[in-house]
Amino acid sequence: MPAAIYDGDRKYEGKIRIPAVSITDAPRFPHRGAMMDVGRNFLPKEEVLKFLDLMAFYKLNKFHFHLTDDQGWRIEIKKYPKLTEIGSYRKQTQIGHSDYYFPRRYDGKEKRGYYTQEEIKEIVKYASDRFITVIPEIEMPGHASAALASYPELSLSLIHISEPTR
């Protein structure tokens, strides 16, 4: 087999001819996707690109990019700079779930990070070069604590959120 097959080179388009053998490789489903939740746990751009390479290797074609949630806002919006100044940061993360019998526990580690508009463009192009469509997700109106911590004037007057949910 040509080495390019193992390097992720897509020029063969799933069709390779071997003497006396014909292999046709085609996906069964038109929508083959994976989701990455960077809203809750930020990952650097390089990790996202590695994930896209892995998706391409397995012929996945839809990348659900979960960019916001209560725990963090991960995409730069120049008109609303507080979304990344405040919303991309949290003091610590809750470990597991809590209830009456099990009090809340936290890891004590600060979390911070977001993607600039240029980085988002680079990710989209990188995905497109691998025949992957990026489906960005921005949570609204639910799961919006990071946005409301950044712009509390947008929330109900009865609710005050000082930082993204831990």
Residue ranges: model-predicted function:
Residues M1-L158, S162:
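Feature activates predominantly on carbohydrate-active enzymes
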Residues T165:
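Ser/Thr-centric signal marking residues that sit
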